[in-house]
């Protein structure tokens, strides 16, 4: 009979050699079985040089385990059973996540803490492969999990009085290995903070008289994270620092083992890291032998066993305690973190630098994706409008000749501004989300806050070959005389072709005047994170803290994190605060974490300038006139620091003059005035060139150019006055039964514009519907008037200022070019009637005697209103727009004073096998301080738009579209639909204001990532064409989440004819044709017809000269919205 000492030394001493460790969170089917601790009988002699139990599946077995189409057995959820990852392929069984419980296999399971699995193959009687895998229930050919021992429970309580006590205050995860089974540490036992939990101890009745084996995770690691087949990235699972084991022999003696984990010692990094917790075995009774038994990391780290303890396989120390029945034992988990931290505080490996201004802020810690949160204090209850847009592209469109586009390339995240010759101003930022396409991970993020706008951009590597084309069509149709109106069913119809993809569309039409808040604060946050040895950081920060806002502040943050490499960050930031801020402050932080492999340097160029201007408008009621003036100056200086740099230092100056006159007439009447201010600048451009190289890779960063073009300010004031007893109405049409023709036109204005290339007319109208039946459109409005007051007014001011930054970056491993351009525009001193729709309805708002009333879904919202736009984004977030508007006045004086700062860095970085790039951000802002003699009404309205293009060209499929307009048809100006595609959808979409003729932006992308776009238009006879290159064979799927809103301004036409065709240029087949002739009549209706074309995949082998089949043709979903226009007599 073996002696007690022999039994003690034999507890869990068999260790197998290390083999492959999988990178998955659990070990997958087919991995080599190992955890370096053999579950051997503890009362039999075992040579310490026991041969490794290295078990592998063959290919046939892997296919059998992973096949999903065979018969599978469901997890029974019996008494005391615990499901392991029930949402994975194992469906709750104690197996690898991608291993299935299929017919003809044994499926082990986990039990609650203190309980053991009571079922296994009765014929599996030895610890040899594959018998050691046959635990749990047998899955028969009918898909039923069968008990091999019908009279025994699924789970039964263990023996021995052994428990775990947590003294760390964070809780401990003990993870038991599955045997018989794949021996992964999947069976969870959670010891709550400062509590005690029983451990399951098997006796000789358990399978093959084997012991229970546990991995002891660090404090605070959950069983979800710790009871897995881990990796060396974290000391969890089979990489945990400590192991424990327990069993009872035939003499009812319980043996408990504590020791170091050999796999933890194998790792060159973890073997040098001392855990901050230890294990100690305590007995209550007089039969314990083998004490003291502990693992104390304070001196020797994970090898902190008592002096003289035996050494097992892998050089791991251990100790064993045995005790008889009647004695209880506890494994106490001890916290040494504070004691070890105080003794090694000088060995901290984190380097952090920070600079603080008048207020303290928290350090920005290194992370792969950081989005800053910017808070703007309000001015007062009557002059603030703030918008918050989450996970959406955003654009502020001030004038009517803009197309704002955001493009994403395969290895870059770029925001680009495209403007027509008559454009005013636009701010564009986009959200790009891509996954990694190589072995490393790289991401960048930037967050910008501007007056009334808060947005964010994030980007990571991803691409998907999808292509989408939008065509927006606006035309006028002759409907006959008043006696034969078209019914609502024919106007509001929806045409849908057969489609494999369900696409839901909706749209709304509204009329509003864009305005902006007086001023807000702005700040910039930029960060970049590299993984492994891929290092690239280029941060550009600029902050302007503007005046007239109480408690305004601005912050600049820059952070960098590098793994397995080093960088040094030298960043220069600048900020300026103007006067009129009761409590203004700024703070800056620069943080960097680095190692000792190599270094890189980031240098920067800083620029600062000041501007000031004053304006005053005085109203003289006696003469019904207003006069005013605006004057100001500005200066700009540039300085640079950094190696190999050269620059020019221009000085710019500008002068602004203007005047205004206002003529009032009796009510009701139109009162309008136009004020134009033009600013000219001198030497308003600067060039900065910097070259730098890192060791061995000879990379370069050069050619940075900054420009500041001429600024133009245009202000236009218009309003309508109503009588005390009636609402202003130009046209009224009686309600007809069954149709939607009962509209009252409240206000109609006509204007003409021409820029030398295109020309056209626009008509805007604001209408209310008097239909007693359910409206067919999403447009409703109402107005009330008790005393002579303004029923509708608009004062809009736009400031156009565009800045651009172009940079290129190259490396010998991979070559990419990155171009970024960002403009941030503020609209100043604006007051307007504003209407913002939702998905299902549209809200109209008017001024009344009480100041402002918002009518939204039948609810009077008082002085403020908010509207939510639905968004089916991955995070479930919604875009929320809010505004506060007060009663407008015509008498006010203003002064303008502000300053602007720029920070334009260049960088040189080391690149080891992955692509990195640099990006720059430039911020331009202007400020205004009102001195109010009475309340000033301000509001803001923004239209979001974005476009992206990313396709791979294989077998191209080309379509062309053309439209022809004859005679004197006036151009139609439309704010096209705003679409927020899925974040994972990489497609070609376009939104924004389009020109008079319907044009389709085109883009092609070859494997070299080249892009091109072409459109053409003319004033009288206009044609436009585009070519679309589609990837084949590629499945193209379009998932449209929502339309936000549509704004249309449409003009009456006279005797035009329009033909619109879409042609498959490969087969020369006309896919779609519209030809409409017009006859001038006393009544005219206009609707917007928007069509989404989806191009399904067309295999190269199925191409023919005939028209594509219905399944491969585009799928169209159309919606119609109607706007009633003022009737016009025939010529």
Curated annotation (Swiss-Prot):
Bias (Polar residues) ranges: 716-725, 738-763
Glycosylation sites: 58, 123, 252, 551, 593, 631, 689, 766, 806, 857, 920
Comp. bias (Low complexity): 623-715, 726-737, 764-773, 780-819, 893-909, 977-1027
Span of the signal peptide: 1-23
The protein's Enzyme Commission number: 3.2.1.-
Annotated region (Disordered), positions in chain: 609-819, 893-918, 977-1031
Biological processes per GO annotation: cell wall organization; polysaccharide catabolic process
Gene Ontology cellular component annotations, sorted alphabetically: extracellular region; fungal-type cell wall
UniProt keyword Signal present: yes
Secreted recorded as keyword: yes
Function (record text): Cell surface beta-glucosidase involved in cell wall biogenesis,.
Protein name from the UniProt record: Probable secreted beta-glucosidase adg3
